């Protein structure tokens, strides 16, 4: 007879008959303690992940509205959304296995940014470096390297953009078309594909528009490996987003 077995028997004799103790043997107590330890460990892991996310998100380019975006809180109302969710989640889960880029194209407000951010957030928690940047910000930073006061050269910036595990370029096609923009995007995609690094693109343009804007060479490189081209064809639900859903 163990100490705890005797303890529980004495406790039951002292307690009123209408009160039943939570545990009446040492096996149940041990199992409860182990379960509490497991829950505590999971809580600590979640907190550590949240802290890591907060530290990294300041450098990832993911906007505040999308910081909590995940595959779990992506709203599904029809098969089209179910399809892009499944493909995006599989892309993130299989990221280490091969080189694969993605293009999310379609109407504004259809969830392209949500799923791109969900991919980024997932990869951050799995130790990957990601950067989400708009074409406007990208070109602004590039042109900023021309100023005499900048310590960063165009080559330095191109190197940094080519070094992150996943670079996602948003709002492709929103800017006034320029030859310099085409050259820079071409260089970035070329460098990244040559070093087996993945690139993501988000655009309101369709396949024909993307090909016309970026050229066959860039589109061809964006299709290397098990790359994705997902089309978001449904109506915008951005008007229903209040900002507190995530």
Curated annotation (Swiss-Prot):
GO biological process, alphabetically ordered: DNA replication, synthesis of primer
Alphabetized InterPro entries for the sequence: DNAC/IstB-like (IPR028350), IstB_ATP-bd (IPR002611), P-loop_NTPase (IPR027417)
Record site: Probably involved in the interaction with the DnaB protein: 69
This protein's GO CC annotations: primosome complex
Pfam families linked to this entry: IstB_IS21
Domain of life: Bacteria
An annotated Gene Ontology molecular function: hydrolase activity
EC code(s) of this entry: 3.6.4.-
Swiss-Prot/TrEMBL keywords: ATP-binding, DNA replication, DNA-binding, Hydrolase, Nucleotide-binding, Primosome
Catalytic activity: ATP + H2O = ADP + phosphate + H(+)
Subunit structure as annotated in this protein's UniProt entry: The helix loader is a DnaB(6):DnaC(6) complex with a crack opening large enough to allow ssDNA into the central cavity.
UniProt similarity note: Belongs to the DnaC family.
Function of the protein: Required to load the replicative helix DnaB onto single-stranded (ss)DNA, to initiate chromosomal replication. DnaC alters the inter-domain and inter-subunit interactions of DnaB, inducing an open ring conformation that allows ssDNA to access the interior of the DnaB(6):DnaC(6) ring. Has ATPase activity only in the presence of DnaB and ssDNA. ssDNA binds to the central pore in the DnaB(6):DnaC(6) complex, making contacts with both subunits.
Name of the molecule in the record: Replicative helicase loader DnaC
Gene: dnaC
